[in-house]
Amino acid sequence: MLLGALEAGGTKMVMGLADGDGNILKQASCPTRLPEETLGDILAFFQGEKIDALGIATFGPVDLRADSPTFGNITNTPKLAWRNFPLYARLKDALGVPCAIDTDVNGAVLAEAELGAGEGLKNCVYFTVGTGIGGGVLSGGQLVHGLIHPEWGHVIMNRHPEDPLQRGVCPYHEHCVEGYACGPAMQARWAMPAQELPDDHRGWALEAHYLAQLCVDAMMTVSPERIVLGGGVMHHEALYPMVRQAVTSMLGGYLASPVLSDMDSYIVAPRLYPDSGLVGAALLAKQALAQ
């Protein structure tokens, strides 16, 4: 079994080949340019290989309603050239193999729950914190969709009273978590990128405040057995204990569970990073083949 995997990102595309267990055998990447140019690069990678199926874990929003005539299309993305682009249909038609598509963060949570930091769990959340913020949910062993798919980055937050930003940087919402806690928000707030902030900078406590709100919202709604925090901003490892401490404080003793007595094991880093999304795409391909 040879599985094709595509992690379609707003900045770059990562293509991979994997075996039936999700092990990545080969990978390459290309910049995300105009759709037709980028599609040519993707197909050049896969058409020389005899893949049995393709899994696509993509940036969004993406139409995931199985009965929709635009299933698999990128929808109202800020990347204007990609709006309404039929990514799934174009790749499926060109490669002629079974295909599956989901969000990049749903791909990541699938991978981490099956093979990574949430291995063996049926209820898990994965949040990525970088240029944007997104989240994938595995509930009862199934990826969560619905009206569209979860848009965790745009959950509305309470602004910290000491935040220098009066509103977040999101063009759609004044007070969503992406607007306050993504990499560009940190740049706008402190006039320097997150990776340049000193370890003792108060910006990290502010970041933990917003990410803790996000985690608590998830705990109160989808009740995950583990929360995985990934993405470029989380490279600052000291952020993890700060988020855990803030979550404990915000919970106020609510949600009595022995699991929460060990926050170090509850809110964790991804084990498969930076390949969580690519491995997830391979697992989506395996599902497509099984159907």
What does each model-found stretch correspond to?
Residues 99-103:
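General beta-strand structural signal in soluble alpha/beta enzymes
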Residues 119-178:
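Glycine-rich phosphate-binding loop of actin/hexokinase-like ATP-binding domains
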Residues 1-54, 62-70, 89-97, 111-121, ...:
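ATP-binding/phosphotransfer module of carbohydrate and carboxylate kinases, centering on a glycine-rich
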Residues 86:
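A conserved beta-strand->loop->alpha-helix hinge within the catalytic CA
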